[in-house]
C-alpha cells in the first residue's frame, strides 16, 4: 500500500502546539496495518514521525528499526531458502501503523528479544493526539503479542508517556542508568594488601577479558568491548561465595587502569535497583548521563 506523509510541522520539525482535539478529527477512516517487512520509503516516514514527536516532546526516544531491517530487493521470484532460514522475527510484525486517509499518523515499533520477551516504543503525531489513537495501537499490540512479556523503555524526562502507559496497564519496573567516566579521571592504581590476589588479561578482537584470581582460583571477571573512542564494560561478575569483600572494586580498578590509554571514555549500563553495583560505579567516579525507566504490564 502507498502512504502519504503529512503533518502540521514545518521543514525543521517545529509543530503547532495546538494539537487538534477529538471533535476535529474523524476517526471513521482510521485503519491499522501489521507490517513485517520495512522498505526504505516506509522507514523514512517512520523516522520523520519519530523525529517530529521527539522534538515536540523534547525527548530523545528511538525506535527499533534501522536500515538493515529494510527490504530493498525487487526480486519477486520465490526463494526456496527463505522458509529454511526462517527466524523468530519473520513470524511477527516489526511495526503496527495507524493510517488515516492514506496518511501514517502513528505507529508502534516492536523489538523481539527472545521467544517470550519484546520491547516496544510508540509515536503519534502531535496534531492527531488526544483521539485514542495510541490506545487503539496498544490494543492491536495486545492481540498481536498476547504471549509475550512486553517491556517499554521511557526516557526519564519524558512527561507524556507515563500517564498514557498507566492508562494502558503498564507500570514502572526498573530504571537503567547509562554511566561514563573520562579516562583522564582514572588515576588510582589497583591496590590490595592480599598477596593471594592476582589478575589475568586476555585480548580478543574488539574485546578484552579481565579475570581476578584468589589463591590461583578464578573468582570473577569482567568484559570490555573496545570501540573507536570508548570502551564499554559489561558482564561484571564475582563468584557468589566471594562477594562483599571488595573484589569487584579491585577488578574494576585493575581493568580501568589497564585500558585508560586506549579509550577516551568508558561507558556502562546498570539498573538502579542493583544498589551495590550502582554505588560502586559512583565511588569509582562514573557519572550518570541518562536514565531509562522500563514499564511492563505485570
Residues covered by each model-derived region:
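Conserved acetyl-CoA-binding loop-helix of GNAT-fold acetyltransferases
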Residues: 130-143, 244-257, 279, 283
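Glycine/small-residue-rich hydrophobic helix-like segments
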Residues: 218-261, 265
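Conserved active-site alpha-helix within GNAT-family acetyltransferase domains
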Residues: 135, 156-175, 249, 273-290
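Short amphipathic alpha-helix that is part of the acyltransferase structural core
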Residues: 2-6, 21-65, 171-217
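Active-site acidic-Proline motif in GNAT/NAT acetyltransferases
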Residues: 125-127, 131, 239-241, 245, ...
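Conserved donor-binding loop and adjoining core beta-sheet/short helix segment
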Residues: 54, 58-75, 84-131, 135-136, ...
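Intrinsically disordered, low-complexity terminal tails and inter-domain linkers enriched
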Residues: 2-25, 67-91
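Conserved GNAT acetyl-CoA-binding A-motif
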Residues: 145-157, 261-269
